[in-house]
Swiss-Prot record:
Name listed for the protein in its UniProt record: High affinity cAMP-specific and IBMX-insensitive 3',5'-cyclic phosphodiesterase 8B
Species annotation: Mus musculus
PANTHER family tied to this protein: CYCLIC NUCLEOTIDE PHOSPHODIESTERASE (PTHR11347)
Record Gene3D superfamilies: 3'5'-cyclic nucleotide phosphodiesterase, catalytic domain, PAS domain
Record field: catalytic activity: 3',5'-cyclic AMP + H2O = AMP + H(+)
Family as reported in the entry's similarity comment: Belongs to the cyclic nucleotide phosphodiesterase family. PDE8 subfamily.
Function: Hydrolyzes the second messenger cAMP, which is a key regulator of many important physiological processes. May be involved in specific signaling in the thyroid gland.
Compositional bias per record (Polar residues), positions renumbered to this chain: 23-36, 402-415
């Protein structure tokens, strides 16, 4: 790339080799070049030549082959020159490619990374270093067990070479075990370098090495070619096999998320694998199927008597079979499937497995309608059953060719116009809503006038942008409801010139002398006793707030994150987690009456409680759980104690930055990631790979943005229509098997996570009465303070009823529960089964209703205060 690499030695003793960020020189500064190397997986790989060499090795080993390169070989920007240090290299090399047939089955990866763990430099470590250099591997050297583990967790090497010749510097087997205890080591090959056995001693057994986690043993030999041969054998043997195993993990992940039912059997028809879609379709759990013969499962009596013999005759010849087959579900129902069975040739050129793909043959009403329209309109291209069954995936749309040909008798014009019209049609029908509109338009053609007019009205509604949001004006003219809707569901009313509200955060740190815990085991006994009850919904967060001096988030976070194995998933230490929780909590404003770290801890507690419910747990994987807990922790970080509407009306810096759209929610997520990644001491994401990080980050952002109230009804209605209604139909024994619930589909997992954090965020009315009353007082005080400031600054008062002199808190709570809470928690309860919460909600509503009937505007009756 034209840059000179630099060598960095960390404080922990790892020699890190990387390209220099400071050099922009296009010149080649190395006096040592590399020859051709062995192929790796048949892919072109460019490396930076083991990152770099230690200074002592820069001149090359004795007898090293030096190859001069032409400008063409080095590239136009990498000519040899005299500038730059003469002992550093920046080389790229290319590997030859395998056949296209093999390449199609491979997964790409960068050059092999090797970690050498030697306490001191000697001829053996030199031999492996130069062998790595010759092979084009990226190489690091670690001198201590601690630095070795740190380096491995950072770079995830494919090969690790550990010096096992002497034990006075470190215990090689202990080092190996510590590496094997980490998740990234699953596909790593670890090589032990052992001393040559003397002639009078019997050669030692390799079993202790294997038990410690080593894969291979290498007899001490400092010859570069011996080390090179060993590494090349490992690359072409174990490393390549490990990459195939990694690819298998990806394949099985794809199978688990595939919408088609997949069944894999052995050559004697013993079931060896079924995916979740198969379980949903057939009603069995895979534990009931694995290891059973297909002949032992119940059969449907709707198939032809000779169908099974026909299928077996076909597939035993190595031919693929596909057709319609009736299967019997666990419930006893017969379902019609389109089945495709493929024999898999394995060892010895014989059939070793059969892979079956199964789809339900269920024609929806819309498909029937389209089929009828095609038939009635005389479109003969779709009249053959076979053609109809195997036509384009866009079968739910009207054929463009038949439409365009109706009004024209000029074939040449039609032929010229058809390709462009088809392209336009293919662009517009991809969106699901467009498919729906096309189906309705087709249905109108043969419908009575009254039905056609009704469908016109349906089309008008479908063409609006807010399909899931209710018409707010249809609600009763209750001022409390109107103010809540205006204050929480709009991003601002109007901008008043000259009234710029500059948002400045004021972080309040507690000055108590309560020492922070290093781990969950170091929590003071008084706090630990409170946290013993944190799994209960009735957990009192205010007691934790008091005993922790308004720092409940760190302590509850340590306990909850430990319970869900967050550190293990993120591959970080509890010290890093504690530092992160401290930073996040420090950026909550303790001066806020409501939006402070106690509210964040309360939302974290509710989220953890929901994650423990059986159906929620069964719908999400561990990444979802970790993302939900992190999102709950950061969802209101740096909240100013003012609503989005206030910030937009005041022209705050944040409102300008985020274009008056989801201002606070966008700020919470952005700041949370900024705080996390700017300091490695609190960066809980530093040890996860890029793909996991991006997936986790996207999930966290999506959940925090879901707490914005402007899309409240959209999220709730999508959840009801996509999750609750299919579940209800399933429980009622619906005959339609076309659309299984699919709670584990990614799009449905997103809806579940959004609904979960939304409910956790506003769960105060579902808490025990004393807690509910305290939260009501706090949120009212925060709204009162906002109204006071709006009046002082001459800003629009977005919630006039929250005037501390006239407000009825019971009325505001009743309106909030009626408008936002009841329907949402009814839907969430139908999914997660939360009878205790719903009872609290009913009791609390009764409390507020009693106060309102008595014309009491306070939190409690005066006699109860």
């Amino acid at each position: 790339m034209g840059c000179a690499p630099s060598i960095h030695v960390s404080q922990s003793g790892v020699i890190y080799c990387r390209d220099s960020d400071e050099s922009n020189s296009p010149r080649q500064t190395s006096s040592v070049s590399q020859g051709p190397t062995a192929p790796l997986h048949g892919l072109f790989v460019q490396t930076d030549a083991a990152d770099a060499m230690p200074p002592s090795r820069a001149a090359g080993p004795p007898g090293a082959v030096r190859v001069r390169r032409s400008r063409a070989e080095l590239g136009s920007g990498s000519s040899t020159g005299s500038s730059g240090p003469a002992t550093t290299t920046c080389r790229g090399r290319r590997r030859h490619c395998c056949s296209s047939a093999e390449a199609e089955t491979q997964t790409s990866y960068t050059s092999v990374k090797v970690l050498l763990i030697f306490a001191k430099e000697d001829s053996q470590s030199d031999g492996f270093w130069w062998a790595c250099d010759r092979a084009g591997y990226r190489c690091n050297i670690a001198r201590t067990p601690e630095s070795a583990l740190e380096c491995f967790l950072d770079k995830h090497h494919e090969i690790i070479v550990i010096d096992h010749r002497q034990s006075r510097n470190f215990d090689a087997e202990a080092v190996c075990r510590s590496i094997r205890a980490t998740n990234p080591s699953e596909h790593t090959v670890i090589l032990a370098v052992v001393s040559q056995a003397s002639d009078d001693h019997e050669e030692a057994s390799v079993l202790p090495l294997l038990h410690a986690g080593f894969n291979r043993r290498f007899m001490e030999n400092s010859s570069i070619i011996a080390c090179y041969n060993e590494l090349i054998q490992i690359e072409h043997g174990e490393v390549r096999s490990q990459f195939k195993l990694r690819a298998c993990n990806s394949v099985f992940t794809a199978l688990d998320h595939c919408h088609e039912a997949i069944e894999i059997t052995s050559d004697d028809h013993v079931i060896q694998y079924v995916n979740p879609a198969f379980e949903r379709m057939m009603g069995y759990h895979k534990g009931e199927l694995l290891g059973k013969e297909l002949a032992d499962l119940p059969k449907s009596d709707k198939n032809r008597a000779d169908l099974l013999d026909t299928i077996n005759t076909c597939i035993k010849k190595g031919k693929e079979w596909q057709g319609v087959y009736y299967a019997r579900r666990k419930s006893g129902d017969s379902i019609q499937q389109h089945v495709k069975i493929t024999p898999v040739i394995g060892q010895g050129g014989k059939i070793r497995h059969f892979v079956s793909l199964k789809k339900l043959c269920c024609t929806t009403d819309s498909n029937k309608q389209i089929h009828r329209i095609h038939r009635d309109s005389g479109d003969n291209s779709q009249t053959e059953p076979h053609s109809f069954r195997h036509k384009s995936r866009r079968k739910e749309s009207i054929d463009v060719k038949s439409i365009s040909s109706r009004g024209s008798d000029a074939p040449s014009l039609q032929n010229r116009r058809y390709p462009s019209m088809a392209r336009i049609h293919s662009m517009t029908i991809e969106a699901p809503i467009t498919k729906v509109i096309n189906i309705i338009n087709a249905a109108q053609e043969n419908s009575p006038v009254t039905v056609a007019e009704a469908l016109d009205r349906v089309l008008e509604i479908l063409r609006t942008t807010e399909l899931y949001s209710p018409q707010l004006g249809t609600k009763d003219e209750d001022p409390h409801t109107s103010d809540l809707v205006g204050g929480l569901m709009t991003d601002g009313l109007r901008r008043l010139s000259g009234n710029e509200y500059v948002f400045t955060k004021n972080v309040h740190h507690s000055h108590s002398h309560l020492s922070m815990p290093i781990t969950i085991n170091d929590v003071p006994p008084s706090i630990a006793q409170l946290l013993d009850n944190e799994e209960s919904w009735d957990f009192n967060i205010f007691e934790l707030e008091a005993v922790t001096h308004k720092r409940p988030l760190v302590y509850l976070g340590l306990k909850v994150f430990s319970r869900f194995g967050v550190c293990e998933f993120l591959n970080c230490t509890e010290t890093t987690l504690r530092a992160w929780l401290q930073v996040i909590e420090a950026n909550y404003h303790s001066s806020n009456a409501y939006h402070n770290s106690t509210h964040a801890a309360d939302v974290l507690h509710a989220t953890a409680f929901f994650l423990g419910k059986e159906r929620v747990k069964g719908s999400l994987d561990q990444l979802d759980e970790v993302a939900a807990l992190i999102a709950a922790t950061v969802h209101d970080v740096d909240h100013p104690g003012r609503t989005n509407s206030f910030l937009c009306n005041a022209g705050s810096e944040l409102a300008v930055l985020y274009n008056d759209t989801a201002v606070l929610e966008s700020h919470h997520t952005a700041l949370a990631f900024q705080l996390t990644v700017k300091d490695t001491k609190c960066n809980i994401f530093k040890n996860i790979d890029r793909n996991h990080y991006r997936t986790l980050r996207q999930a966290i952002i999506d959940m925090v943005l879901a707490t914005e109230m402007t899309k409240h009804f959209e999220h709730v209605n999508k959840f009801v229509n996509s999750i609750n209604k299919p579940l209800a139909a399933e429980s009622e024994g619906s005959d339609c098997e076309c659309n299984p619930t699919g709670k584990n589909f990614p799009e449905n997992q997103i809806l579940i996570k959004r609904m979960m954090i939304k409910c956790a965020d506003v769960a105060n009315p579902c808490r025990p009465l004393d807690l509910c009353i305290e939260w009501a007082g706090r949120i009212s005080e925060e709204y009162f303070a906002q109204t006071d400031e709006e009046k002082r600054q001459g800003l629009p008062v977005v919630m006039p009823v929250f005037d501390r002199n006239t407000c009825s808190i019971p009325k505001s709570q009743i309106s909030f529960i009626d408008y936002f809470i009841t329907d949402m928690f009814d839907a969430w309860d139908a999914f997660a089964h939360l009878p205790a919460l719903m009872q609290h909600l009913a009791d609390n509503y009764k409390h507020w209703k009693t106060l309102d009937d008595l014309k009491c505007k306070t939190l409690r009756l005066p006699s109860d205060s």
